[in-house]
């Protein structure tokens, strides 16, 4: 079997052992090269992070300029002011304003009647008379 494989592959059998995980020649400088590669990757990542931080700072300066120009507040500032206003109103007050009832909360009865009427339309005449009484 080995003979057939050697004949079929020719001179590539020497490299075949290396491909299959056999004896690999160790490069004496491989460890040093790997350290240099990792150091270069780390430096590239630091540079990228620095550029990104600088870019974000420039964007924030531009955003703040637009906010100042048009009198727009940041979302966090709006929320903080709203919370402070709510606390100021509610502190020590027994008569604080109640939460507003959303529209449509008391309209459930009308909806139920309309659903019942809709169902009654599809029933035969004698059954409609029974349910109407």
From Swiss-Prot:
Q: In which tissues is it expressed?
A: Nervous system. Present in electric organ (at protein level).
Name the UniProt key words of this record, in alphabetical order.
Answer: Coiled coil, Cytoplasm, Exocytosis, Neurotransmitter transport, Transport
The keyword Transport is annotated on this UniProt entry = yes
GO biological process, alphabetically ordered: regulation of neurotransmitter secretion; synaptic vesicle exocytosis
Coiled coil, from the record: 28-60
Q: How does it assemble?
A: Binds to the SNARE core complex containing SNAP25, VAMP2 and syntaxin-1.
| UniProt biased composition (Basic and acidic residues) | 15-40
Matching CDD domains: Complexin_NTD_CPLX_I_II
The record lists the organism as: Narke japonica (Japanese sleeper ray)
| Localization, UniProt | Cytoplasm, Cytosol
Protein name, as recorded: Complexin-1
Q: For this protein, what is any one GO molecular function term?
A: syntaxin binding
What function does the entry list?
A: Positively regulates a late step in synaptic vesicle exocytosis.
What InterPro entries does this protein's entry cite? Synaphin
- Pfam families per the UniProt record, alphabetical: Synaphin
Q: Where is this region: Disordered?
A: 1-40, 85-112
Q: Which family does it belong to?
A: Belongs to the complexin/synaphin family.
The GO cellular component terms are: cytosol; SNARE complex; terminal bouton
Predominant subcellular localization, coarse grouping: cytoplasm
């Amino acid at each position: 079997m080995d003979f057939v494989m050697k004949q079929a592959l020719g001179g590539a059998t020497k490299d075949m052992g290396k491909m299959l995980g056999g004896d690999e020649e160790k490069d004496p400088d491989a460890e040093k090269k790997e350290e240099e590669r990792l150091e270069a990757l780390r430096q590239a990542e630091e540079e990228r992070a620095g550029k990104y931080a600088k870019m974000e700072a420039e964007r924030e300066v531009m955003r703040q300029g637009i906010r100042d120009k048009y009198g727009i507040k940041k979302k966090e500032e709006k929320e903080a002011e709203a919370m402070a206003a709510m606390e100021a109103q509610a502190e020590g007050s027994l008569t604080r304003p109640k939460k507003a009832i959303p529209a449509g909360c008391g309209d459930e009865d009308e909806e139920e009647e309309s659903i019942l009427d809709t169902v009654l339309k599809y029933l035969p005449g004698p059954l409609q008379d029974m349910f109407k009484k």
